Amino acid sequence: MLDRDGFRPNVGIILLNQRNQVFWGKRIRTHSWQFPQGGIDRGESPEQAMFRELHEEVGLHPEHVRIVARTRDWLRYEVPDRFIRRDARGHYKGQKQIWYLLQLIGHDWDLNLRATDHPEFDAWRWHDYWVPLDVVVEFKRGVYEMALTELARYLPRQDFRNRFLRSNVRAREFERHMPDGGAPAGLDLPPGGSFDPHPDITSASDDPSPPPHNKAPFLPSQR
């Protein structure tokens, strides 16, 4: 289902823990990390699609989260031609997304990457709010920055430190707002989780590797 400009309707999910760190998932059998996202089916509202994708990709139910905010309008990104199936080129351009900011009100152990028989992720971790901009595949960076920036105003004050990081405030200016001890706190490793200590993306070709069950990203009828 494409709009007249060739963009597929989609939802993106930024899931916060109690420390305002964001869920960051590794796509199954790839080295690519990203936020949960997925297409809006015909007849679905963006919110209905968001809750469906939340369960399919992360294993959470509506009672596990609180909706903090969503983007006001569609945010778009174009997919490079080399990642689009040849028979879709010329009429499919990319994704248009509504982004949701969610607060986890359950526990880390409520997350389940195997909630369905077609998992999207095979590992996950918590990251500080702005870190994904440094590691997401290049053609998604713009839409990630727009979503994170628009939704950052709804973060509790405890994320003040991360805003300095994103603004490239360094040295003395940043240190004035840091607790004694200097470096930002380390990541929480949830029980039973599987983690890649270096989730860096080395090339754009890592991102679009299709997962099983034909849920390949970036195709008009797919994710």
Swiss-Prot record:
<feature type="domain" description="Nudix hydrolase">
    <location>
        <begin position="6"/>
        <end position="149"/>
    </location>
</feature>
<feature type="short sequence motif" description="Nudix box">
    <location>
        <begin position="38"/>
        <end position="59"/>
    </location>
</feature>
<protein>
    <recommendedName>
        <fullName>RNA pyrophosphohydrolase</fullName>
        <ecNumber>3.6.1.-</ecNumber>
    </recommendedName>
</protein>
<feature type="compositionally biased region" description="Low complexity">
    <location>
        <begin position="180"/>
        <end position="193"/>
    </location>
</feature>
<dbReference type="Pfam" id="PF00293">
    <property type="entry name" value="NUDIX"/>
</dbReference>
<comment type="similarity">
    <text>Belongs to the Nudix hydrolase family. RppH subfamily.</text>
</comment>
<comment type="function">
    <text>Accelerates the degradation of transcripts by removing pyrophosphate from the 5'-end of triphosphorylated RNA, leading to a more labile monophosphorylated state that can stimulate subsequent ribonuclease cleavage.</text>
</comment>
<dbReference type="InterPro" id="IPR020084">
    <property type="entry name" value="NUDIX_hydrolase_CS"/>
</dbReference>
<feature type="region of interest" description="Disordered">
    <location>
        <begin position="175"/>
        <end position="223"/>
    </location>
</feature>
<dbReference type="InterPro" id="IPR015797">
    <property type="entry name" value="NUDIX_hydrolase-like_dom_sf"/>
</dbReference>
<keyword id="KW-0378">Hydrolase</keyword>
<dbReference type="InterPro" id="IPR022927">
    <property type="entry name" value="RppH"/>
</dbReference>
<dbReference type="GO" id="GO:0046872">
    <property type="term" value="F:metal ion binding"/>
</dbReference>
<dbReference type="InterPro" id="IPR000086">
    <property type="entry name" value="NUDIX_hydrolase_dom"/>
</dbReference>
<keyword id="KW-0479">Metal-binding</keyword>
<dbReference type="InterPro" id="IPR020476">
    <property type="entry name" value="Nudix_hydrolase"/>
</dbReference>
<dbReference type="GO" id="GO:0016462">
    <property type="term" value="F:pyrophosphatase activity"/>
</dbReference>
